[in-house]
């Protein structure tokens, strides 16, 4: 699902 999140959003996780 990483493809659906931006690098900024991934940083939160």
From Swiss-Prot:
Keywords (A to Z) from UniProt: Acetylation, Calcium, Repeat
Membrane-crossing segments per the record: none
UniProt key word Zinc: no
Residues where N-acetylalanine is found: 2
Domain EF-hand: 8-13
Family: Belongs to the calmodulin family.
Record's miscellaneous remark: This protein has four functional calcium-binding sites.
Cited function: Calmodulin mediates the control of a large number of enzymes, ion channels and other proteins by Ca(2+). Among the enzymes to be stimulated by the calmodulin-Ca(2+) complex are a number of protein kinases and phosphatases.
Name this protein carries in UniProt: Calmodulin
